[in-house]
Swiss-Prot record:
Beta-oxidation of fatty acids. The highest activity concerns the C6 to C10 chain length substrate. SUPFAM superfamilies: CoA-dependent acyltransferases. The modification N6-succinyllysine is found at K40, K57, K406. GO terms for molecular function: carnitine O-octanoyltransferase activity. The gene is CROT. Monomer. This is Peroxisomal carnitine O-octanoyltransferase.
Length: 612
């Protein structure tokens, strides 16, 4: 073990980036075969035959030409998907991204040394910030261990995007600006932005070449809070980041035209390490029920979140914490890693600051005061109005299932992630009486700048098993057999998707090549079964495993009649979050989660069946 630790400090965080394999282009025939299999649960015989004919025509016609063009594209770049994915999945999207695209999550400090307690916001906030800043320094020094699967390194590029990164709204397409540099690359910004009661402050976290201590950070936060609590609220320019993207882009251009100083202020916020949000709310939270705090993280006060920042760290009045992140620059596992690092350090230090109490003579924080006029104030009010309207429609529950967890599923030789996915399939089937097309995230970080691929858990095998569970004449043994077949299928799909053999991103690539070539949209993509099975961003169940650490995530559904279902796995429990829109009469997040918990028990009961 000692050797391993010594070795890990010698490895630099980004040292393998140049030697990672390029993202492969899968075989056309294989992808189409997998696609056909995935639409089966949503088609009758006639519809399936029709789609089969469309696929065959595509494979032997335009599909082959598009595949050749895609292979050409892949020759010239190490990741043929990267730029496309960023644009299509994030930067071209015009709907407000803060609520619809961002992800968030509550900190689990409440489970040990930091239960909710009024009057602790600033002291705890400064300790949490200090650990976050240590993580930033590890990244700058490239001392963060390279993540690996076995001995194979994973792409670490997304970790460059955690700090000093921001999305900039554009009229038709947004852009991402990243100011972070490692120490060997040169200067990197070292200031924090703090939002409080509609006002914006910044201060440098380095003083005379050293990182501020937690008591020094606390002094800065106290100065800001006292000032904000004894003076009128600011205009809340941050609320503009909740707006529809083109609207926000125009409002931003107008803001800059009012006074060039406004651009300087925007750039200071954009380049800040992270945005620390002092929130006056005191949401309820327990280790078994994170619903209220999670909702506030996703849909809280828009004047104290900068929706375009890659990292908003939120401190509530009762000393409870959470994060809200723009999804464009990175996927949730980056946030999971920093949150876990901070939580472990808080745990190790019993929630206290154990360093020096000395506070150096440090310049007070600088307030950034925007020049605003009637039009800007109107824009802010309009942004808030549309934000609160959508926010009031969100239903979100986050509960812990504590009867068992990973330990028991492993004992039964069941993959815990697959266990939850199949429970969700059964729960949806029981609640809605039909199969639910489902998106589960697989990671493709084995490849250069790899991000994600789609696993489609609603397989023929899963549906057959769900039907057997609802059919009183099917024996328990048959049900168990069918369940294990569904497990095997899911595990194989996950393996394929993680190793570059998925088909969703491949089909996206083929459709984008057609678009770039000015060709008509191939029939494959206009076939009703394409969208009914989830294609084109139509998955009714949008899901992801957040990991095996004490970190939970939340996101809104992908479609109006769908659910956002995110979960993490521990030895003794499964923690799940489920979101839905109240204005959709057929969805109910609370009921779905109860059905999932019910399914967990039913599945475990099947495993108690002796092998005959």
């Amino acid at each position: 073990m000692e050797n391993q630790l010594a070795k890990s400090t010698e490895e630099r965080t980004f040292q393998y980036q140049d030697s990672l394999p390029s993202l492969p282009v899968p075989s056309l025939e294989e992808s189409l075969k997998k696609y056909l299999e995935s639409v089966k649960p949503f088609a009758n015989e006639e519809e399936y035959k029709n789609t089969e004919a469309i696929v065959w025509k595509f494979q032997n016609g335009i599909g082959e030409k598009l595949q050749q063009k895609l292979l050409q594209r892949a020759k010239g770049r190490r990741n043929w998907l990267e730029e496309w994915w960023l644009n299509v999945a994030y930067l071209d999207v015009r709907i407000p991204s803060q609520l619809n695209v961002n992800f968030g999550g509550p900190a689990s400090h409440i489970e040990h040394y930091w239960p909710p307690k009024e009057g602790t916001q600033l002291e705890r906030g400064s300790i949490s910030l200090w650990h976050n800043l240590n993580y930033w320094q590890l990244l700058r020094k490239e001392k963060l261990a390279v993540e690996k699967v076995g001995n194979t390194p994973l792409d670490m590029n997304q970790f460059r995007m955690l700090f000093s990164t921001c999305k900039i709204p554009g009229i038709t397409r947004d852009s991402i600006i990243n100011y972070f540099r490692t120490e060997s690359e040169g200067h990197s910004p070292s200031h924090l932005a703090v939002l409080c009661r509609g006002r914006v402050f910044v201060f440098d976290v380095m003083h005379e070449g050293y990182l501020m201590t937690a008591p020094e950070i606390q002094r800065q936060l106290t100065y800001i809070q006292k000032k904000c609590h004894s003076e009128p609220d600011g205009p809340g320019v941050a609320a503009l980041t909740t707006e529809e993207r083109t609207r926000w882009a125009k409002a931003r251009e107008y803001l800059i035209s009012l006074n060039p100083e406004n651009l300087t202020i925007l750039e200071k916020i954009q380049s800040s390490l992270l945005v620390f949000c002092l929130d006056d709310d005191s949401p309820h939270v327990t280790p078994e029920d994170y619903s209220q705090v999670s909702a506030k993280i996703l849909n809280g006060d828009p004047t104290v979140r900068w929706g375009d920042k890659s990292y908003n760290l939120i401190a509530f009045s009762n000393g409870v914490f959470g994060s809200n992140c723009d999804h464009a620059p990175f996927d949730a596992m980056v946030l999971v890693k920093v949150c876990y690092y901070v939580d472990e350090n808080i745990l190790e230090n019993e929630g206290r600051w154990k360093g020096s109490e000395k506070v150096r003579d440090i310049p007070v924080p600088e307030e950034l005061v925007f020049t605003v006029d009637e039009k800007v104030l109107n824009d802010i009010n309009q942004a808030k109005a549309q934000y609160f309207k959508q926010v009031s429609d969100l239903q979100l529950v986050v509960y812990a299932f504590t009867s068992f967890g990973k330990k028991l599923t492993k004992e039964k030789q069941l993959h815990p992630d697959t266990f939850i996915q199949l429970a969700l399939q059964l729960a949806y089937y029981r609640l809605h009486g039909r199969p639910g097309c489902c998106y589960e995230t697989a990671m493709t970080r084995l490849f250069y700048h790899g991000r994600t691929e789609t696993v489609r858990p609603c397989t023929v095998e899963a549906v057959n098993w769900c039907q057997s569970m609802q059919n009183p004449s099917t024996s328990l043994l048959e049900r168990k057999h069918m369940m294990l077949e569904a497990f095997a299928k899911h595990n194989k799909m996950m393996k394929d998707c993680s190793t570059g053999k998925g088909f969703d991103r491949h089909l996206l690539g083929l459709s984008l090549i057609a678009k770039e070539e000015g060709l008509p949209v191939p029939e494959l993509f206009t076939d009703p079964l394409f969208s009914r099975s989830g294609g084109g961003g139509n998955f009714v169940l949008s899901t992801s495993l957040v990991g095996y650490l004490r970190v939970q995530g939340v996101m809104v559904p992908m479609v109006h009649n769908g659910y956002g279902f995110f979960y993490h796995i521990r030895d003794d429990r499964f923690v799940v979050s489920c979101s839905a829109w109240k204005s959709c009469p057929e969805t109910d997040a609370e009921k779905l989660v109860q059905q999932v918990f019910h399914a967990f028990c039913d599945m475990m009961q099947l495993m108690e069946m002796p092998h005959l």
